[in-house]
Amino acid sequence: MLWMVWVFLLKPVIVFSIAYILFRLAGKKAVSQMNNFDLLLTFAIGTIISEPILTSKLPMSIYYAGAFLVLYLIMSKLSLSNKWRWLLVVSPTVLIRNGDIDERGLRKERLTVNELLGKLREKGYADPADIDLAIIEETGEVSVIPKEEARAVQVRDLNMEAERNFIPIPLILDGEILDHNLKYLQKNRSWLFEKLEEKGYSPKLLSSIILGTMNARGDISLDLNTANEPQHDPYLYKPGNNN
């Protein structure tokens, strides 16, 4: 009887752990980036691995899920070869070419003109005439290449040199110091505390800092969870009765 209780309690944990391991082995992709093989694997493993929760066929389910994973990895490997890719992966479909909507492409992908216009608006374009090329990728995502006169102005168009992008490095997150980032910068906590004191913040108030980052100049920017916003500012208005 005790054994039955343990099986009942541990089976969901085992099933979840196995499913997690299988999906980690399959690789990481967002749902929007999945092709047909990725979706097939997701549904198949989800269905197969959930069966042991209702039945006692855990070993058989693990075997079938593992077999699906092996087949998926083989097919994914083959899809990297130009010889097999045309057979295994759906080719992109042209939806707009030189500002003209391709009706055959829309019919093939079962898209309406309204849906296509919505996809363009998501990319920041309202008029198909501004589009040089729009294609639907194998993942279902629509890629848009605007005409030269419709694209956003680039720095090189102004004969200017752009500074290299710098991603602010988080040093404090939710009141906790990220020591691994300090180590990466060859800094220590004493240096960070000095920077905080320069800004008028005591290390004792560390818990009130939601985010602290270092920019390219070495300056520290802080975002506190105690907002100190001016009242009755029209720019801070929000709909509702909580103003």
From Swiss-Prot:
Q: What is its main location?
A: membrane
Name the phenotypic consequences of knocking out this gene.
Non-essential, it can be disrupted.
Annotated TM spans: 3-23, 34-54, 58-78
Please indicate which superkingdom the organism of origin belongs to.
Bacteria
Q: Please give, as recorded in its UniProt entry, the membrane topology of this protein.
A: Multi-pass membrane protein
Keywords of the record, alphabetical order, are: Cell membrane, Membrane, Transmembrane, Transmembrane helix
Q: Which GO terms describe its cellular component?
A: plasma membrane
Q: Where in the cell is it found?
A: Cell membrane
- The reply to whether Zinc figures as a keyword in the UniProt entry is no
Q: Name one Pfam family in it.
A: YetF_N
- Please tell me whether the keyword Endoplasmic reticulum is annotated for this protein: no
Name the family. Answer: Belongs to the UPF0702 family.
What's the name of the protein?
A: UPF0702 transmembrane protein YkjA
The species is Bacillus subtilis (strain 168)
